[in-house]
């Protein structure tokens, strides 16, 4: 059986690092190694990680301060590339410092790669049932996060992704020119070389603990990054059209309310068509929050993707001010 290395990056994740490391060490069968790159933490994360590595030979801790915005436009990508370069196994599984993982996650995610039947696998993400906010539930589908571990997914996220080291080398690694959305760009390139294996039972358990403000800020940052990278034009056009329809309906209210009714029905479909079967279990407050967030999304995407396209200024990362983001 081919060995597998798990890699992750972190910066100022003292509140989460123990949970993620313990869940990765509990994988059955165990990984050959777990390589974690610290980008220069100042909150005690590095001290915890290095002490844990001194007790656990499978845990490889690397401190590389070039994997931060002080030195790199894309610190998360750089951290992953550093970790993968250091990893000794021919198969790489990506994990995330803001997630935890079931004991069979690694086995399920890499099964077809280990068997030689795939080069690239995607497991997806679902909300951690042990801790979430109403805005986590409301914003989930807009960040490719599922509400249930049994919900099918075909989304790409480096929270649960595996590939051969050879594929990573052919692609040229994770793109270091963007702060966020780097896994999407990696996925675009990977699909030029191979077809992904979608694994339904290998989801990362994610606990973002969002407020409306933090969820909106994250959506804004992803849109700016898409604009800077020049990707997802169809999403920009779709969301711009929704903005135009909303404005037209409001302007027409003094004469007729039919356009407003049409927009209401359209936005209801956008808000709930993906996962209402799971969403309604979270209660009426979550349903209302989902509708509210969905109405705001086209404005966040359209305005900020255009802004990103015409801005050369790199995004800022609040990890550099001492707050973790689970990335």
What are these regions (language model features)?
Residues 38-47, 66, 99:
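A conserved acidic beta->alpha catalytic loop
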């Amino acid at each position: 059986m081919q060995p597998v290395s798990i890699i992750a990056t972190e910066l100022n994740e003292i509140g989460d690092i123990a949970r993620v490391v313990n869940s990765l060490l509990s994988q059955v069968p165990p990984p050959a190694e777990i390589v974690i790159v610290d980008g220069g933490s100042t909150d005690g994360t590095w001290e915890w990680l290095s002490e844990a590595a001194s007790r656990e030979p499978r845990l490889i801790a690397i401190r590389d301060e070039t994997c931060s915005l002080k030195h790199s436009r894309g610190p998360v990508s750089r951290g992953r590339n550093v970790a993968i370069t250091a990893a000794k196994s021919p198969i790489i599984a990506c994990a995330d410092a803001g997630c935890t993982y079931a004991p069979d996650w690694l086995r399920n995610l890499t099964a077809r790669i280990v068997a030689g039947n795939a080069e690239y696998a995607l497991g997806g993400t679902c909300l951690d049932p042990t801790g979430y906010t109403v805005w986590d539930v409301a914003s989930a589908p807009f960040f490719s996060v599922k509400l249930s571990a049994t919900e099918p997914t075909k989304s790409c996220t480096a929270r649960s992704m595996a590939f051969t080291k050879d594929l990573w080398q052919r692609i040229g690694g994770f793109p270091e020119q963007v702060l966020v959305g780097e896994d999407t760009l990696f996925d675009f390139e990977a699909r030029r070389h191979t077809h992904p294996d979608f694994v339904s039972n290998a989801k990362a358990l994610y606990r973002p603990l969002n407020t409306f403000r933090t969820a909106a800020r994250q959506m804004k940052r992803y849109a700016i990054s898409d604009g800077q990278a020049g990707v997802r034009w169809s999403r920009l056009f779709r969301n711009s059209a929704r903005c135009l329809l909303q404005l037209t309906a409001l302007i027409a209210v003094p004469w007729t309310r039919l356009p407003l009714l049409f927009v209401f029905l359209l936005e209801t479909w956008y808000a709930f068509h993906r996962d209402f079967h799971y969403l309604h279990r979270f209660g009426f407050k979550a349903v209302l929050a989902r509708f509210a967030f969905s109405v705001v999304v086209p404005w966040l995407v359209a305005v900020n993707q255009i802004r990103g396209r015409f801005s050369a200024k790199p995004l800022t990362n609040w990890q550099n001010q001492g707050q973790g983001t689970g990335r």
